[in-house]
UniProtKB/Swiss-Prot annotation:
Consists of a catalytic RNA component (M1 or rnpB) and a protein subunit. It is an enzyme of class 3 (hydrolase). InterPro entries: Ribosomal_Su5_D2-typ_SF (IPR020568), Ribsml_uS5_D2-typ_fold_subgr (IPR014721), RNase_P (IPR000100). GO terms for molecular function: 3'-tRNA processing endoribonuclease activity; ribonuclease P activity; tRNA binding. This is Ribonuclease P protein component. The lineage of its organism: Bacteria, Pseudomonadati, Pseudomonadota, Gammaproteobacteria, Vibrionales. It comes from the Bacteria. The keyword Nuclease applies.
Length: 118
């Protein structure tokens, strides 16, 4: 049976983890956010979030964005490849409704989980 928990092992926790993702990564983006991914040697995907105060001004907005990203990742984790993902917010992300943001994330997860053609 699949589990949908979002445990500590499913998170990028240290600056070193984030740095590894930014090196030799591939990305999928939209006008509202970018997801950067890099393969890991683990048996599960991991998620990191980068939501700059400069992009989403209010704490409420940043927390909403992070909450929806975590929930989307939690529900899609069993279909995702074993990669480390970093979601980076852009200014226009605060204008999306919760449902629009959730649907956009679903499409980007799917795009990044496809096998590479190279």
């Amino acid at each position: 049976m699949s589990t949908y928990a979002f445990n500590r092992e499913l998170r990028l926790l240290t600056p070193e983890h984030y740095q590894k993702v930014f090196q030799q990564a591939h990305s999928a983006g939209s006008p509202h956010l970018t997801i950067i991914a890099r393969a890991n040697n683990l048996s599960h995907p991991r998620l990191g979030l980068a939501v700059p105060k400069k992009q989403i001004k209010t704490a409420v907005g940043r927390n909403r964005f992070k909450r929806i990203c975590r929930e989307s990742f939690r529900l899609h984790q069993n279909q995702l490849a074993n990669k480390d993902f970093v979601v980076i917010a852009k200014k226009s992300a605060q204008d999306l409704s919760n449902e629009e943001l959730f649907n956009l994330l679903g499409k980007l997860w799917q795009r990044l989980s496809r096998p590479s053609r190279g």
